Amino acid sequence: MMITKKLYQCMCLLCMVIALLDVVSSDDAKEQKMKDKIISLPGQPPNLNFSQFSGYVTVDPAAGRALFYWLTEAPRPSGTKPLVLWLNGGPGCSSIAYGASEEVGPFRVNPDGKTLRLNLYAWNKVANVLFLDSPAGVGFSYTNTSSDELTVGDKRTGEDAYRFLVRWLERFPEYKERAFYIAGESYAGHYIPELAQLIVNRNKGAKNPTINLKGILMGNPLVDDYNDNKGMRDYWWNHGLISDESYNDLTKWCLNDSILFPKLNCNAALNQALSEFGDIDPYNINSPACTTHASSNEWMQAWRYRGNDECVVGYTRKYMNDPNVHKSFHARLNGSTPWTPCSRVIRKNWKDSPKSMLPIIKNLLQAHLRIWIFSGDSDAVLPLSGTRHSINAMKLKSSKRWYPWYHSHGLVGGWSQVYEDGLLTYTTVRAAGHEVPLSQPRLALFLFTHFLANHSLPSSPS
């Protein structure tokens, strides 16, 4: 009896300690959240009607890996709006540099590199948007273990992003169980399905999962090496960008090769094909050519980087290297190392990169996750033809055949097809490049709003 009583007392004491630790942990999270609140960014417009937070979440204490985030909440009250995580690709490119500063974020950097203007088509008008620099070593994210940047790949990036979400939600508990989506572009065609798969697997058996994943949205994504190589070749030849000889060489050497690390013969075929493009921007073949790179060789290497167009981030680069901006963002940066939009070290040393995301995408559909994929039809980097080949390879059931969709001005915004009783939607965006929200911001917001509402894009003018 005495032993039972003592055991009971010990159990009660243990419960009290655990409860106390939970309270302390909760208080620490609240305190850190308030420290993360952005009072004002340098040069930001006055009288904003939304809140911003930014800072770090440690994902591996032993290695000292910490990921940087920037949360731009929806206009107040934001409590009913979903949470959307935005990821850029590369691999090795910053979501703060591209997604936040050039595409779907609330601000654009002015030509002076010092002041900001409002983005009229910011996605935080309809959702709370969370931008993440991933993996560690990209943008403002960092690691205290230098070898991390030489050994990272898809697997660790996904695991770290999952840990980030779990720990970030402790800091922002109001977003627990909130409708959650993952969006992004380019190599995020790997990041997004892989992270979604982790969430789905770890949510199994949970009645009210903390990460309430509802769907994913991918723009001009890399999802399958074979089909993307095939689609790239087709797009280049069909648009008159390359010769018959280059078409044949790409067919011979590149179809079964790696997108990230092509072998010698494929590399030679790609370089020859690129030399035939002339003075155009492959990220948007109908836009003025990029003049950032000093030589054609540098231009081709930058394009082959297959991350994001560095030509569009000149103003952002200047802004993000301002120490006052770092202070306002609560960002840590080595004073001797300038902020860069992409990490060439990470890109060059990327380790694991599965050849195809199609099996994962099919698994996500079987888990009844909603998937939208969109393509800017002027992108020659990861063109629409590759994505269409990939979707066809999955042999999905068509629910609504190919049709033109119309935006709010009654004009054709692109073309779309719906599969698997509405679970997967594919759509193109007219006159848009690799970064659709950059070249067609109005259409991108229109598409995003329909995605969140689970409404098909309109098939007739309104």
Swiss-Prot record:
Subcellular location field: Secreted
Protein family according to the UniProt entry: Belongs to the peptidase S10 family.
Enzyme class: hydrolase
Residues annotated as signal peptide: 1-26
Active site: 186, 379, 434
Protein's name according to its UniProt entry: Serine carboxypeptidase-like 28
Stated role: Probable carboxypeptidase.
Gene Ontology biological process terms in this record: proteolysis
Keywords tagged on the record: Carboxypeptidase, Disulfide bond, Glycoprotein, Hydrolase, Protease, Secreted, Signal
GO cellular component, one term: extracellular region
Tissue: Expressed in seedlings, roots and senescent leaves.
Disulfide bridge positions per record: 93-342, 254-266, 290-311
GO molecular function terms attached to this record: serine-type carboxypeptidase activity
Organism per entry: Arabidopsis thaliana
EC number annotated for this UniProt entry: 3.4.16.-
Chain positions carrying an annotated carbohydrate: 49, 144, 256, 334, 454
Domain of life, source organism: Eukaryota
